Amino acid sequence: MNHEYNPYENAVAVIRKAAEALGLHENDYAFLLYPERELKVSLPVVMDSGKTEVFEGFRVQHSSVLGPCKGGIRYHADTNIDEVKALACWMALKCSVAGIPYGGGKGGIRVDPSRLSSRELEALTRKYAHAIAPIIGEKKDIPAPDVNTNGQIMAWFCDAYSETVGSFSPAVVTGKPLEIGGSLGRTDATGRGVMLTVRELLSRYGKKASEMRVAVQGNGNVGGTTVKLLGELGCKVVAVSDVSGALLCDDGLDCDEIYRYSAEHKLLRDFDKSAGTFIAGADGNAALLVCDTDILIPAALENQITGENAKKIKAKYIVEAANG
C-alpha cells in the first residue's frame, strides 16, 4: 500500500468536489466530512507458541442518518484507521445512492491472517467481537465479511457477540453460514453483480462476450466469483491475480479450474505453471493492470489505478468492483 496516500483525505476531497459541482454550501454537507464515531481497540491473543501478541483493531461508524451503520470487517496487514474511515464513508454514500435504509460503517484488524492458525484466528475474532460489542447491534451497526474474512469468521463473531449480550443474536452480522441464518446466494452476490454489470455493458455497446478479453485483479470472494461467472458468460479471462501475484495467458485461462483451486484457499503462485505466465507479488498485480485486455476489473484493494499507471492502461472499459 502507498503510505503517502491517505484514503480518508481522498474520500473527503471527492465529497467536497461533488458538493462544489452541485453548488452546495458547506453547512449542507459538513456532517459528511467526519465520522460519527471511531473506535480503536487492542486485542491480545495467546499464540500457539505461547507468546502473547497484541493486534490493533478498528470500527468506524461514519453516518447513521438513514439507519443502522452497515459495512464489512477486513483483516489485512496494512489496515489502518484512515483506510477504515474512508471505507465507512464510502459505505454511507453507497447505501444512500442505492436507496437502502442503512448508514455506513467499516471495521478492520491490522493482521496478516495467513500467518495465523485456525485457533489463533478464532481467538482474535472473538476478542474483536467482545471489544466492539458495546457499539454494534442489529439496530446500531451490522458488520459483514470483507477482505480476508468469510462466513466462518462471521460465525465466530456472532457467537462471541451473543455471549457478550447474553442471547443468540444472529442479526448482528450478515454473511453468516446458512446454518445460523445466513442468506442463500450471499457469498456470490457481489461477484454476480459484477458479471451482470459486464453483461449490461456488452449489451449496451453491442459487443459479444466471446470477443472480450478480461483481466480481474483479485481472486477472493468478489474476484473469484467474477472470474467463474465471466467464464460461464463466454468471456476470455486472460489475467487473474491475488496477493501472491498474477497469472496471465493470452489464450485465456480455465476459469472453472481456477475457481475450484482457489476455493481450497490456495494461492495462484502454486497453480499449474503450464496454465500461463506467473509474475510474483506486486509486480504481477502491476502487470495485470496494464496488460492487453478489453475489460479491466479491479476487485481487490483500493487505490490501484493511480496517476502513475492510468495512462498505461490498455483496457477500453473498467468495471469497478473494489471499494475505492
Residue ranges and their predicted role:
Residues 2-6, 201-202, 316-324:
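Adenosine-phosphate binding glycine-rich loop
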Residues 114, 152-154, 221-232, 310:
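Short glycine/threonine-rich loop-to-helix capping motif typified by GTGT followed
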Residues 136-138, 207-211, 291-293, 310-317:
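Short, surface-exposed connector motifs at secondary-structure boundaries
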Residues 182-290:
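Glycine-rich phosphate/diphosphate-binding loop of Rossmann-like nucleotide-binding domains
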Residues 295-324:
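ADP-ribose/adenylate-binding Rossmann-like module
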Residues 1-184:
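N-terminal ligand-binding/catalytic initiation module
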Residues 163, 199-207, 299-302, 324:
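Conserved helix-loop functional segments at active or binding sites
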